[in-house]
C-alpha cells in the first residue's frame, strides 16, 4: 500500500510514526520547499501556499495540511484538513475565514490539478473535538480550520466544503505570496522615499537662496 493510501485513508490516523512522517514530508514536495499546493478563497481574497504539517514556522506565513488527514488530492472517501492562523499583525492568512457562508467556494491547486469545493457546513467546536473532520463514506471533503473567537482562540472554526465541478476561474490569479501586508505597515515604507525626496528638494532650494 502506498503512503498516499496509508496516510489519510479510511482509517484516519492523526499520529504518524517517524517513518510515516518522513514519507509524508516527501509527498507532493516536487520543488523541495515543503509546499504541497495552493489554496484560493475568492470571496475573502485569500491565496496562500499549503505546506506539509502545522508547525508554528509554517503557520506564521502560510497554511498547513494537518498530517493524518487525507492528502489534498481529492477522491471518494477523503477528507483533507487545512489549518491557518488568524489575526497576525503581518499576515491576514485565515483572519476572515468567519466571513465565509454556505455556498461559497474555495479551490486547491495541486500539481496540475484544480480541486473545487463548495462550503456546506460551518461549525464551532472545542479544540479536542475531531468528530467533524473524519471521513464520510462516499464523500470528497475538505475542511478549513482556524481559531475563534478572534483574539480569544478558545474554540475552533471549521468550514467544510464538498467537491464540485471546477468553475471558470480564468480571471482569478493564484500567487505564491503567503503574506498580505497590513496597510499600516506598508504606508511608512511607501512614504519614506517620498519624504526623503521632498527633503532633498527643500535643501537644494534653501542652498540656492
Language model: regions and residue ranges:
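C-terminal single-pass membrane-anchor helix
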Residues: 173-209
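Solvent-exposed, non-transmembrane regions of membrane-associated and secreted proteins
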Residues: 1-184
Amino acid at each position: 500500500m502506498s503512503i498516499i493510501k496509508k496516510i489519510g485513508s479510511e482509517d484516519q490516523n492523526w499520529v504518524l510514526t517517524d517513518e510515516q512522517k518522513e514519507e509524508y514530508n516527501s509527498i507532493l514536495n516536487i520543488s523541495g520547499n515543503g509546499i504541497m499546493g495552493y489554496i484560493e478563497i475568492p470571496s475573502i481574497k485569500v491565496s496562500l501556499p499549503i505546506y506539509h504539517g502545522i508547525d508554528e514556522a509554517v503557520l506564521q506565513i502560510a497554511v498547513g495540511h494537518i498530517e493524518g488527514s487525507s492528502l489534498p488530492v481529492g477522491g471518494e472517501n477523503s477528507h483533507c484538513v487545512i489549518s491557518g492562523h488568524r489575526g497576525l499583525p503581518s499576515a491576514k492568512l485565515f483572519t476572515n475565514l468567519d466571513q465565509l457562508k454556505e455556498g461559497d467556494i474555495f479551490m486547491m491547486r495541486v500539481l496540475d490539478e484544480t480541486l473545487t469545493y463548495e462550503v456546506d457546513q460551518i461549525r464551532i467546536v472545542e479544540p479536542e473535538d475531531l468528530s467533524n473532520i473524519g471521513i464520510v463514506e462516499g464523500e470528497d471533503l475538505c475542511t478549513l480550520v482556524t481559531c475563534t473567537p478572534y483574539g480569544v482562540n478558545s474554540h475552533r472554526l471549521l468550514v467544510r466544503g464538498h467537491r464540485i465541478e471546477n468553475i471558470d476561474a480564468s480571471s482569478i490569479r493564484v500567487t505564491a505570496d503567503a503574506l498580505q501586508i497590513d496597510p499600516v505597515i506598508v504606508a511608512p515604507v511607501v512614504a519614506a522615499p517620498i519624504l526623503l525626496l521632498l527633503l532633498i528638494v527643500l535643501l537644494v532650494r534653501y542652498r540656492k537662496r
